[in-house]
Amino acid sequence: MKTFTLLAMLLLTACATNSEVEKRLLAMYEQDQSIRHQQLALTKAITTEGQTYLIDSLIQVIDIQQQIDQRNATFVDSLLQAGLPKELSDSAYHAIWIIIDHANLDMQEKHLSYIRQMAEERKIKFKEYATLYDRIEMKNNRPQRYGTQIIQFGTSNSPQLYLW
C-alpha cells in the first residue's frame, strides 16, 4: 500500500501544474503552523498557568502534529524526487523548508543539500538553511555551526538561554 501511495504521489506531482503544487504547499504550511500554534497555546496554559487538565488535549494535538508532519514530509520528499516545478513563489519555497525542518532526522539529512542550494539561489533565507543545519547537528550531538538552536529557562523577567 505504501508503494502504491508513493507511486500515486509521484504521478500526481509529475502531472501537477505550478499552481496546483503551490496551493498544496501553502495549505500544508498553514496546517503545519496552525497545529503548532495550538500546541504552543496548550503548553503555555499547562506550564505557566497551571492548567494541567489540558495535558490530554496537548497529547492529542502532538499526535495530530506528528501525523501532519509525516504526511507533509512524504509529499515534499516525492516532489523533490520527481523534480520541482519551475518558478514557485517564495512562500512555496519557504513551505518546503519548514516541512523539511519539521520532518524526521533522516529526511532532514537527505534534503539538507537541496535546502543549501535553495539558500544559495536566494529562494529561501540563509538563516533558514542555518537553522536546519544546526538542528541536524544538535540531533546528532555535534556542535552547531551557526548557533541557532537555543532553549530559554527561567522566568520572562530573568531568562537564561542555553545554546545546544
Language model regions located:
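Sec-dependent signal peptide recognition
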Residues: M1-A8
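Residue-level signal for functionally critical sites in structured catalytic/ligand-binding pockets
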Residues: T3, G50, D69, T155-W164
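C-terminal motif of bacterial Sec signal peptides marking the signal peptidase cleavage site
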Residues: T13-A14
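Preference for long, solvent-exposed alpha-helical segments and helix-linker "stalks"
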Residues: T17-D90, I99-D106, M118-E121, F126-E137
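Mature-region segments of soluble proteins
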Residues: S91-I98, M107-W164
